[in-house]
Amino acid sequence: MVELKEVADRIYHFESRLSVMTSLFTVYLIKESDGVLIEPGPAALVPRIQEAMKKLEMKNLAYIMPTHIHVDHAGGMGKLAQLYPGARVLVHAAGMKHAADPTRLIESTRKVFGEDFEAGFGPILPVPESQIKVPQDGEVIKVGSRELQIVHAPGHAPHHMVVFDRSVNGIFCGEALGLPEGEHKQIPLPAAAPPSFDPEIYLETMEKLSKLGARILFYSHGGVVGHNADSLISQAEENTRLLGDVIFKALKDGGAIQDVNRKVKEYAARRFDMGLTEMDLTLTISGYEVYYKRKGLL
């Protein structure tokens, strides 16, 4: 059963844990005259989305908005487009081709999660081009009395964008502002998954988003934080720099990957008073390593 919670004015969410991932994923529904779905997730979540919509008495969707074209955020958009043919699917220009033809998304998902990835995520279907809308940076989508500003936010991925809800001063931030960790979600660590992570662009995006004056951060992995938004963004910037420095030094010094993992884990324990899971470590180190090699620094 879906546990829906109203987290801001007419904004509802539910969280799900996918069998193939360690982190929770958060789906957001905005109940206006026309329904809005932010972060559709993989196709495996479509039945839960439909259950949530039924509870909210939402019969249709006007907009489906994945923040970026990774399977855990956007794998279900094709299935949802079939179910709601009147909906427009908003994607970054850099992600449009992957929405219309998800061949590369399927290949990359299979490479990471194996041949049976559909057992955990469900099928990845194409979105009809007639339903795809590519918003400009800063474009405002009006839904009922609500204004949703689309802001391009690369760094985690080149096709990343966020949604700024002006009515509540909240950012649906995807992974552009890090991943909140810790008991009180006060330790935003960089979402550094390879192969496209670029910490320099990531930091530029964080600075850009800090100027929106957000009061609420609607994370896709970590739920909602309705206080200290400025402080969290500043911490995310600082942690992105510090972890990058530690990982670069450990990689530059050489040694086995186990040694690099140990150094980063020890640093994180001292700095953040918390442990990182093996998946956190692997993805974070790999994301920075791929970036440093791409830049010719390693």
Give the ranges of each region predicted by the language model.
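Active-site metal-binding motif and surrounding structural segment of the metallo-beta-lactamase
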Residues: 46-94
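C-terminal regulatory/interaction regions
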Residues: 246-298
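Divalent metal-coordination and catalytic microenvironments
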Residues: 10, 30, 39, 68, ...
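Conserved beta-strand hairpin/beta-sheet module of binuclear metal-dependent hydrolase folds
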Residues: 2-55, 60, 163-173
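Short, electropositive alpha-helical surface patch
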Residues: 226-243
